[in-house]
């Protein structure tokens, strides 16, 4: 965890982590700090408790988030990568706004699958003061996210809502008249429980910690079933999201989703063509050894997108 040259220029996590500052912000991190083979301070990223405390320190030191915790066995997100998605999405909005990232409570974002960690709303509000609606099918995850929001006094900035129909993503979620500048989604990656387990085992092995007698750790490759896999995997989930987005075409400026598997792009592009998207963007992202990309689509042409921003400014 030394140099991270591929991070977005506005990402707060460039270069080495400042462990003295992190420990000052959250002293509990000191008991998890080790010296890596290069003689630099680090943590054991195979220790889920260490990762959770590290995230808590990072959020407090870098973002002013005073209280953050998640239940055991829920995804513990790598924050630099999550922040990159926020910044890349912000640039997407800036492209139609004379190069300026729109900030403030007039900008509304929808996080599909907000999770127990509530990470995208926390980062997006901290960096750009956007307001968020976070949705999830899991009531335990929503209860955790709600506790984080309330503990940090963010109830006016971050609203949480359960998607009551597990077969739907967007359908039936939005209320009459709700409009969003942006949607975010980090979809389930795997197509089955077995595939998800194999993926966790690969990451476990890559950390050099493979031990058949030891339970797989939870950290950022743990997670509940609905966080890790869905029937049909990433391609089916994103294609369904594209299909459901049509009914909200006029109420959302840009829909976006992360796509981990490049091999899924042709199928997603075909779904977007079928849906009649007027603008499509595929933006590569990379953090360390992990490559991903943001797929974005809009049902508004260039003139309509400019008008959207102008209308929002007039209401500010």
Swiss-Prot record:
Transmembrane segments: none annotated. One of its GO terms (biological process) is rRNA base methylation. It is found in: Cytoplasm. It comes from the Bacteria. InterPro entries: METTL16/RlmF (IPR010286), rRNA_lsu_MeTfrase_F (IPR016909), SAM-dependent_MTases_sf (IPR029063). GO terms for cellular component: cytoplasm. Its EC number is 2.1.1.181. It is an enzyme of class 2 (transferase). Keywords: Cytoplasm, Methyltransferase, rRNA processing, S-adenosyl-L-methionine, Transferase. One of its GO terms (molecular function) is 23S rRNA (adenine(1618)-N(6))-methyltransferase activity. It catalyses: adenosine(1618) in 23S rRNA + S-adenosyl-L-methionine = N(6)-methyladenosine(1618) in 23S rRNA + S-adenosyl-L-homocysteine + H(+). Its main location: cytoplasm. SUPFAM superfamilies: S-adenosyl-L-methionine-dependent methyltransferases (SSF53335). Specifically methylates the adenine in position 1618 of 23S rRNA. NCBIfam families: PRK11727.1. This is Ribosomal RNA large subunit methyltransferase F. It comes from Pseudomonas putida (strain GB-1). The gene is rlmF.
């Amino acid at each position: 965890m030394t140099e991270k040259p591929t991070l977005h220029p506005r990402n707060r996590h460039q270069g080495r982590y400042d462990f003295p500052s992190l420990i000052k912000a959250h002293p509990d991190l000191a008991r998890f700090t080790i010296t890596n083979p290069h003689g630099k301070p680090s943590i054991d990223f195979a220790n889920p408790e260490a990762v959770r405390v590290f995230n808590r320190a990072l959020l407090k030191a870098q973002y002013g988030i005073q209280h953050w915790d998640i239940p055991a066995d829920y995804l513990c997100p790598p924050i630099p990568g999550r922040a990159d998605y926020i910044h890349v999405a912000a640039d997407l909005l800036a492209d139609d706004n004379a190069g300026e990232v729109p900030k403030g409570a007039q900008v509304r974002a929808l996080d599909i699958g907000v999770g127990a960690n509530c990470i995208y709303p926390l980062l997006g509000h901290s960096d750009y003061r956007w307001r968020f609606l976070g949705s999830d099918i899991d009531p335990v995850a929503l209860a955790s996210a709600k506790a984080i929001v309330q503990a940090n006094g963010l109830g006016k900035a971050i609203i949480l809502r359960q998607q009551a129909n597990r077969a739907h993503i967007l359908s039936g979620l939005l209320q009459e008249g709700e409009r969003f500048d942006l949607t975010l989604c980090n979809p389930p990656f795997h197509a089955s429980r077995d595939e998800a387990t194999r993926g966790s085992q690969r990451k476990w092995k890559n950390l050099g910690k493979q031990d058949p007698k030891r339970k797989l750790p939870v950290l950022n490759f743990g997670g509940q079933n609905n966080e890790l896999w869905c029937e049909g995997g990433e391609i089916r989930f994103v294609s369904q999201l594209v299909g459901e987005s049509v009914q909200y075409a006029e109420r959302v400026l840009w829909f976006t989703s992360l796509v981990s598997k490049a091999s899924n792009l042709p199928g997603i592009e075909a779904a977007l063509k079928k849906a009649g998207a007027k603008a499509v963007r595929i933006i590569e992202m990379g953090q360390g050894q992990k490559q991903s990309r943001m797929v974005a689509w809009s049902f508004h042409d260039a003139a309509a997108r400019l008008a959207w921003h102008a209308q929002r400014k007039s209401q500010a």
